[in-house]
């Protein structure tokens, strides 16, 4: 086990790196990756919940995306109108994202399972290793 002190944002990058390599083969490697994903999901649960958009905002975002995908001349105007009609909802989401941004800068300590170099799959890339470097021994 390795205790790592880092920002929540750095741990988000690490969990994304773990998700990116979970298809690689190797029993010990896969087991360690899976265990670390579970540990990081627990450590970042508060961050995930803080960033979850409301159902109302998700509905608005869907409408905006549908309009944007139409590529009509009046799509932009319709999007602007929707955003103005839902100004408070958009403002609340922006404030929510500011809170999440601050949370991403908070430092925490997490104890993760180490990955030994000898269990790294042959097909792992340097880019994938860079996301996991803090837990490789």
Name the predicted role of every residue range.
Residues 2-137:
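A composition-driven surface/loop motif
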